[in-house]
Amino acid sequence: MSAEPEVRLTAWVHGRVQGVGFRWWTRSRALELGLTGFAANKPDGRVQVVAQGSREECERLLGLLEGGDTPGRVDKVIADWSDAREQITGFHER
């Protein structure tokens, strides 16, 4: 039985998500789920979250991002799915 291929979740998080510990919180949740990737502040106020791992764990992270228990205030999350394109080690704040 072969392992499921890894997927890549790219989530654009809109709202009051900078300067409130959002990237740190996201990193902690991603590491708990065994995901790799990063969370980065963008000049327009969004946070870009890139996570790679199993589809199930990436979906769990997306649910947490949309769930309302994050630091700050999330107004919406736009998610894009693709195959894991590169090898990423760890989960980092950028």
UniProtKB/Swiss-Prot annotation:
Active site: 23, 41
Gene3D superfamilies in alphabetical order: 3.30.70.100
InterPro entries named in the record: Acylphosphatase, Acylphosphatase-like_dom, Acylphosphatase-like_dom_sf, Acylphosphatase_CS
Keyword annotations of the record: Hydrolase
EC number(s) from the headed UniProt entry: 3.6.1.7
Listed SUPFAM superfamilies: Acylphosphatase/BLUF domain-like
Enzyme class per UniProt: hydrolase
Matches recorded under PANTHER family: ACYLPHOSPHATASE
Family membership noted in the UniProt record: Belongs to the acylphosphatase family.
Protein's name according to its UniProt entry: Acylphosphatase
The species this protein was found in: Mycobacterium sp. (strain JLS)
